[in-house]
Design a protein with these regions (language model features):
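Active-site rim helix/loop that mediates acceptor-substrate recognition in acyltransferases
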Residues: 30-50
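Conserved beta-strand in the GNAT
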Residues: 52, 58-67, 78, 83
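A short beta-loop-alpha structural element at the N-terminal edge
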Residues: 6-19
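A conserved beta-turn-beta hairpin within the catalytic core of GNAT-like acetyltransferases
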Residues: 69-79, 89
């Protein structure tokens, strides 16, 4: 499998379980119901973006981005989180998400 076989799309509320599962690979213990609540809030905000990498309609990675600004600087993006499933790492998926 290569990164071109992956589709990048905006996260949907129905992705919450998969997102929580992938977050657990980073050491976070996200309850699916809590993840669903937080994801819904993130998706409703215009200053945040949450993208999912799908392979064969299965989420295999995600990135959470937030827009931030300082008085002394233009707006910039902060990466709140980025994960690719262990089985899919080192194939360019993280690069595609970025």
């Amino acid at each position: 499998m290569n990164a071109s076989a992956v589709t990048i799309r905006r996260a949907r509320p129905s992705d919450a379980d998969a997102i929580a599962g992938l977050a657990s690979q980073l050491g976070y213990s996200a309850e699916p119901s809590a993840a669903a609540d937080r994801l819904s809030r993130v998706l409703a905000r215009s200053d945040q973006e949450f993208l999912v990498a799908d392979h064969e309609e299965r989420p295999v990675g995600w990135i959470h981005m937030l827009v931030s600004e300082y008085v002394e600087a233009e707006a910039f993006v902060v990466i709140g989180g980025l994960v690719v499933d262990r089985e899919y790492r080192n194939q360019g998926i993280g690069r595609r998400l970025l």
